[in-house]
Amino acid sequence: HLKYKDPEQG
């Protein structure tokens, strides 16, 4: 998960 933007994208 990403720490920014959309967490469900990464």
Curated annotation (Swiss-Prot):
Keyword check for Secreted: yes
Protein location: Secreted, Cell wall
Domain of life where this protein originates: Eukaryota
GO cellular-component term (any): extracellular region
Keywords recorded for this protein, A-Z: Cell wall, Secreted
Protein name stated in the entry: 44 kDa cell wall protein
Source organism per UniProt: Arabidopsis thaliana
